[in-house]
């Protein structure tokens, strides 16, 4: 049985700022763009979160919720430096490290002999080392499979950890809301609820064939996760190639204005996700996906050096006008393809 740890730093960007400037510790702060430039919040500290300030929220909205909020533009070099130090701490225990972003990673410690092989104690030591060496806090989840380790890391935040042992997997899943499973968004959760599927135990008693019929490949993933199946390995060589966000609509849309409004909202989430893996927002290309009421779909892409909303809207408008053929749209998605590190320098120079 594998031993997987998911480590997630606590409000990482904001925590680095509070560490380096103690005067910020007890006041609400957020990292993000300015209100004048229609900026977006990347992360907020816990005092700010008490006012309802959240990541991916427009800065203007955050300031309405919390007028005294101090918005900081961010220092990506400092965040990268801290992230590298954290990964060096991970490497003391295992070479099997799969970074998800600057502030979170999976570790497979199945063969680690430290702490007598106890994943719980290894996670505790890692968190203590981060606190002592960087003066930052981290939370951790420990489980025999990846998605449960990720869920567990959120259960004792901040500065805590949660363990799900192999014999606790099925009891833990029994009452777990399906909305906690990665990939189940608000619209999917609503569709599941309409079928009477609210917790994993509901799916355990539901027809797998019916799930496949209604949700396609994701229905299979949902069935597996609800039964405690996740065979994905921790992959240290995994190179993230893309970042995306999409939304399935409760009702089809038929007018461009509705699509444009949805893209405006999705763009905020896409920018937030991309900034966690590419703080400079440099990309190889960006694109739009439209899925129609007959479940046919189309993808339109454009080579572009940096995430750009105006270009995405133009690409989407082209797809809407040329490929919709009067059909209602049931899903809208945005995505970017990341630069190949080996080609990044040449590609970026060609755009200068």
From Swiss-Prot:
| Top-rank lineage group of the source organism | Bacteria
Positions annotated as active site in the UniProt record: 104
One of its GO biological process terms is: DNA-templated DNA replication
Give the protein name, as stated in the record. Answer: DNA polymerase IV
- Family (UniProt): Belongs to the DNA polymerase type-Y family.
**GO MF annotation, one:** damaged DNA binding
InterPro entries per UniProt: DNA/RNA_pol_sf (IPR043502), DNA_pol_Y-fam_lit_finger_sf (IPR036775), DNA_pol_Y-fam_little_finger (IPR017961), DNA_polymerase-Y (IPR050116), DNApol_IV (IPR022880), IMS_HHH_1 (IPR053848), Rev_trsase/Diguanyl_cyclase (IPR043128), UmuC (IPR001126)
Q: Which GO terms describe its cellular component?
A: cytosol
Q: Per the UniProt record, which EC number(s) apply here? A: 2.7.7.7
Write down how the cofactor binds this protein: Binds 2 magnesium ions per subunit.
Per its record, the protein catalyses: DNA(n) + a 2'-deoxyribonucleoside 5'-triphosphate = DNA(n+1) + diphosphate
Subcellular location(s): the record lists: Cytoplasm
Protein function: Poorly processive, error-prone DNA polymerase involved in untargeted mutagenesis. Copies undamaged DNA at stalled replication forks, which arise in vivo from mismatched or misaligned primer ends. These misaligned primers can be extended by PolIV. Exhibits no 3'-5' exonuclease (proofreading) activity. May be involved in translesional synthesis, in conjunction with the beta clamp from PolIII.
């Amino acid at each position: 049985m594998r031993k997987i740890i998911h480590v997630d730093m606590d409000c990482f960007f904001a925590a680095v700022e509070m560490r380096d400037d103690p005067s910020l510790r007890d006041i609400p702060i957020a990292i993000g763009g300015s209100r004048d430039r229609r900026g977006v919040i990347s992360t907020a500290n816990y005092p700010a979160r008490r006012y309802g300030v959240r990541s991916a929220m427009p800065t203007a909205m955050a300031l309405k919720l919390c007028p005294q909020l101090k918005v900081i533009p961010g220092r990506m070099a400092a965040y990268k430096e801290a992230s590298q130090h954290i990964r060096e701490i991970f490497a003391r225990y295992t070479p099997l490290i799969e970074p998800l972003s600057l502030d979170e990673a999976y570790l497979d410690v199945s063969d680690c002999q430290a702490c007598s092989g106890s994943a719980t104690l290894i996670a505790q030591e890692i968190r203590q080392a981060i606190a002592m060496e960087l003066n930052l806090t981290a939370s951790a989840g420990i489980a025999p499979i990846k998605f449960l380790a990720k869920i567990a890391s959120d259960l004792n935040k901040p500065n805590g950890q949660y363990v799900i042992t192999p014999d606790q997997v099925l009891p833990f899943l029994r009452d777990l809301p399906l909305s906690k499973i990665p990939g189940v968004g608000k619209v999917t959760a609503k569709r599941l609820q309409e079928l009477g599927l609210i917790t994993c135990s509901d799916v355990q008693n539901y027809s797998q064939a019916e799930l496949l019929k209604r949700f396609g490949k994701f229905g299979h993933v949902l069935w597996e996760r609800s039964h405690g199946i996740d065979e994905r390995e921790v992959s240290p060589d995994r190179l993230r190639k893309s970042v995306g966000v999409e939304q399935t609509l409760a009702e089809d849309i038929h007018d461009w204005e509705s699509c444009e409004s949805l893209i405006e909202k999705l763009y905020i989430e896409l920018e937030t996700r991309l900034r966690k893996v590419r703080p400079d927002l440099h990309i190889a290309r960006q694109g739009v996906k439209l899925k129609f009421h007959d479940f046919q779909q189309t993808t339109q892409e454009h080579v572009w050096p940096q995430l750009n909303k105006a270009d995405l809207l133009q690409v989407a408008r082209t797809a809407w006008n040329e490929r919709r053929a009067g059909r209602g749209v049931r899903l809208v998605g945005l995505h970017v393809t990341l630069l190949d590190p080996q080609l990044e320098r040449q590609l970026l120079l060609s755009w200068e």
